[in-house]
């Protein structure tokens, strides 16, 4: 029965692991719902700023903010939003693949790369992969604050205003639904015009202190809000991916327990059969 004892020990060990993964799945579900609420709450703010920027830009065509001016790209910047923890399937791996692919396209065109990394997984990746990381921040927690991001974002915006980079993009995972998280690379500056930016009303507004100063402030706030939106959405995607990964681990543990239980029963049956055969053989000899 030595084999049966070993199998019984394995079953107990897997059951213990199954309890842990099941608990982690439930925790991820709770955190995902909270992250979804933060994600939904942050969207209207960024959308409204975008609308006001569009109105200001169209109403004051004589002033072009630097964030709205296209220029030849010699150096590009990326703000990379990754997670601080693992056990979330291929979430970070898929994100890094999409980023590296985009970086390679730029490098083939002679464009150099600067990186701002959010999340410890991104920092670890670029320590191994290599890359010019000019700013980094990690351990933002489950409820990130936009104030925690301002310093790192400012480093990249100052680089753009000083002409050290000519384009800035944010790389993060989009939360499509519980089962789908899509890695995306979105251009932040120069600001890309969108169809919904067209004015539906041509009303005149009075701006205080003036339209130029207001636009200057709003452009920075808009970029900060977009990065914050990327962080909270990536957090929701992380929790969804972790929930799915832990569910799969729990299900796989259940399948493995069933297989081992069957092997254990067969081993036990074989041992009993062997003992009966020995008893019968001994009785026949007598």
Curated annotation (Swiss-Prot):
Transmembrane segments: none annotated. It is a peripheral membrane protein. GO terms for molecular function: ATP binding; proton-transporting ATP synthase activity, rotational mechanism. InterPro entries: ATP_synth_F1_ATPase_gsu, ATP_synth_F1_gsu, ATP_synth_F1_gsu_CS. Keywords: ATP synthesis, Cell inner membrane, Cell membrane, CF(1), Hydrogen ion transport, Ion transport, Membrane, Transport. Pfam families: ATP-synt (PF00231). GO terms for biological process: proton motive force-driven plasma membrane ATP synthesis. The keyword Cell inner membrane applies. GO terms for cellular component: plasma membrane; proton-transporting ATP synthase complex. It is found in: Cell inner membrane. It comes from the Bacteria. Belongs to the ATPase gamma chain family. PANTHER family: ATP SYNTHASE GAMMA CHAIN (PTHR11693), ATP SYNTHASE SUBUNIT GAMMA, MITOCHONDRIAL (PTHR11693:SF22). F-type ATPases have 2 components, CF(1) - the catalytic core - and CF(0) - the membrane proton channel. CF(1) has five subunits: alpha(3), beta(3), gamma(1), delta(1), epsilon(1). CF(0) has three main subunits: a, b and c. Produces ATP from ADP in the presence of a proton gradient across the membrane. The gamma chain is believed to be important in regulating ATPase activity and the flow of protons through the CF(0) complex. This is ATP synthase gamma chain.
């Amino acid at each position: 029965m030595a084999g049966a004892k070993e199998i019984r020990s394995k079953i107990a060990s897997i059951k213990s692991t199954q309890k842990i993964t099941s608990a982690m799945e439930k925790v991820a579900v709770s955190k995902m719902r909270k992250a979804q609420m933060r994600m939904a709450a942050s969207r209207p703010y960024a959308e409204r700023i975008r609308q006001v920027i569009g109105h200001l830009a169209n109403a004051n065509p004589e002033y072009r903010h630097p964030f709205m001016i296209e220029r030849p790209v010699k150096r590009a910047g990326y703000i990379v939003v990754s997670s601080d923890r693992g056990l979330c399937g291929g979430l970070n791996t898929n994100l890094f693949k999409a980023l590296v692919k985009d970086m390679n396209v730029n490098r083939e065109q002679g464009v150099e790369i600067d990186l701002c990394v959010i999340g410890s997984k991104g920092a670890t990746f670029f320590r191994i992969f290599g890359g010019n990381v000019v700013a980094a921040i990690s351990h933002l927690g489950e409820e990130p604050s936009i104030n925690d991001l301002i310093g790192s974002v400012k480093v990249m915006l100052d680089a753009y205003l000083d002409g050290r980079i000519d384009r800035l993009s944010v790389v993060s995972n989009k939360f499509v639904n519980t089962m789908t998280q899509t890695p995306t690379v979105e251009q932040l500056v120069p600001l890309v015009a969108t169809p919904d930016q067209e004015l539906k009303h041509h009303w005149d507004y009075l701006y205080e202190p003036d339209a130029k100063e207001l636009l200057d402030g709003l452009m920075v706030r808009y970029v900060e809000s977009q990065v914050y939106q990327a962080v909270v959405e990536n957090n929701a995607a992380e929790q969804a991916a972790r929930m799915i990964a832990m569910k799969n681990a729990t299900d796989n543990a259940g399948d493995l327990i069933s297989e081992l239980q069957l092997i254990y029963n067969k081993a036990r049956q074989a041992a009993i059969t062997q003992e009966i055969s020995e008893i019968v053989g001994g009785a026949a000899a007598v």
